[in-house]
Amino acid sequence: MRKQNSDFEARFISEEGSRLKNRDYFGYVELDEFACYVIADGITEVTDVESARLAIETVILSFQENPSLSKRTVKRLLKRANRALLGKESDRRLKASITVVVTDYQKMRYGYVGNTRLRMYRGGAVYRQTRDMSLAQEMVEQEKIAKDELMQHEERNNLYAYLGQKNFKPVVSKKIKLAETDMIALYTRGIWENVDEAELDDVFAEADNEVQTTVDNIEDLLLSRQPENLDNYTLAVIFVNKVYQNPEKRKRIKKIVMITVIVVIAAIVIGVVLWFLRDRKVQRTEDMNYHFTNTVEYINTGNYVRAKEECEQAQKLAEKL
């Protein structure tokens, strides 16, 4: 029911660039209650797509077996993909960068390792983004190189974390509540080596309701550079046109509001009663003191009859306090 009552639109491109083969891969599955989007960049120097394809197929199949939005699930998906690459018989070690996004059509969570990137936009501005696990990225953070130098820096693909290593430590985000008109971009190095972040931001800031137009605009921007050595490039864009709304949640909210109103009204009534009682007590105390003062004055003047009457009045008021 969630998928039918929400609208997530995904489009992608994946091309070999100037390479002989495309070692990038993108895949996704949209189930009734959950969806999973995965992008991978094979970084093994062989001419097939084994690393990225194997990683994504493993993630998608594992997700379909037990779909969930939990942090544990995202870690499990990435670890299974890592084991798949480690266990594959090959002349060369299989390695890849990967980014996984899972959603229940209300919230999302992502996990990644390597230098495939996620960039999420809300209201036309960057809302979330991944951080490359490369030496060049660390140099940027240490202010050894400028941020715009990372695109072509010689250490940009020198990764300290990736699929296919024994000490595997992926990064998994917290849950992110989705909003309508959110936009999510997943892309490989063929994109970010040639189109800088500011240019991407401009495209998404000016994006209309057509996700395919946004994908085409970014590819046009990339190809307009006419790079001599264009790596494989893959870009996937997901538009969140409508977030699933739980009908039971509306009932719960209404019930909570009604209970809150009742509690507030009760608190006001109790407050008024307490104030009234306190006000009466203050007035009685003042009256008691008045009669007691009169009692003393009548005693001093020798009017004992009036003194007795005033004393009795003061005593009655004291008993009511």
Q: Can you say where each PLM-predicted feature lies in the sequence?
A:
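PP2C/PPM-type serine/threonine phosphatase catalytic domain
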Residues: 1-321
